[in-house]
Design a protein with these regions (language model features):
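Acidic, serine/proline-rich low-complexity intrinsically disordered regions
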Residues: 5-173
Length: 173
């Protein structure tokens, strides 16, 4: 496992994000979850979107696990593989009804979005990087544009090239 505390210290030294960088892992079973974890439905009596679980982890320092029973956002549920991909989501009907923009825009965008295989994972796990007790598959950093620029420069310094990214302006979890 990489030295997460050292990575966290380097991020704080060179970028100083306003909230905790997060260790993220998709778990295939509940047995992979750490002993001390907050689950929205079980511990708070709430269903929340994955993006709010990220906010709780990065702002409050909580280790959060979100499974299908916790997920309040149907779009995030599909992206994370917790819910089946429904026709109304593919053609943009559900997004338009939710006030996310015109149906035709989403009909073009939604099929291009990456999504995880339905049923493959049981939980999304998010924890502040410096307290994570698991090996992350991804490190998530919320940052300002200048900080993102610094991270990109650091990534490309040795290898060169460009960093390519894609965004749809929604359903970004």
């Amino acid at each position: 496992m990489p030295d997460l505390k050292a990575i966290n210290e380097a991020l704080n030294l060179h970028c100083r994000p306003q909230t905790f960088p997060l260790a993220i892992r998709m778990c295939q079973s509940a047995q992979e979850l750490p002993e001390r974890v907050r689950m929205p439905k079980r511990d708070m009596g709430l269903r929340i979107p994955a993006c709010q679980a990220f906010s709780m982890a990065r702002r409050y320092g909580w280790t959060m696990a979100v499974g299908p029973e916790d997920q309040a956002c149907p779009f995030g549920g599909v992206i994370l593989g917790f819910l089946k991909y429904k026709p109304g989501l593919i053609d943009g009907t559900l997004q338009e009804q939710a006030g996310m923009g015109p149906k035709d825009r989403w009909a073009k965008s939604t099929p291009l979005m990456a999504r995880l295989e339905y049923g493959k994972y049981s939980h999304l796990l998010a924890s502040p990087l410096h307290t994570a007790t698991f090996e992350p598959q991804l490190i998530l950093i919320y940052a300002m544009p200048g900080q993102i620029g610094r991270l990109i420069q650091g990534t490309l310094y040795e290898r060169g090239g460009v960093l390519t990214a894609a965004s749809s302006g929604g359903m970004a979890c």
